[in-house]
Amino acid sequence: MKKTTVTKKIINFREKKIAHDLDRKINSVVKDIIKGKPVIVVDSIDRENEGDLVISAEKANIDNVTFCMRYARGLMCVPCNHKILSRLKIPMMVKKTNDKYETPFTVSVDSIKTHTGMSVYDRLKTISTLLDEKSKPSDLQKPGHLFPLK
């Protein structure tokens, strides 16, 4: 067998192993998110080169939201699809962003059933308001402390 053929087989094996390991790690992270555990998602060094603490909005609870507030200490964002944003009449923060990453921020919101919007309980109430299909635009106040992302 030629040296180049052996080298190609070794490289192919390594690539398959890397892909398998990556699939295994991604599956493990997805399982943790489904269980409501916080995970850190790191973006590319070519982008913001940062990590985001991610939890499932459907599994948000006192423990994992407290964890996020205590250790992440940044903006709390909630990804929302077009249907949610339309139903709740949540507008984009700006029509055309000049943010080089084009992060699709909307106007921040709080549930009207919150006190200041800052506490863990207030943030949980706002998250549940966003997720509740029966919620109406009048159930939210703007601006608030949670940032829906389109």
Question: What are the language-model segments listed below?
Answer:
Residues 2-150:
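Catalytic domains of riboflavin
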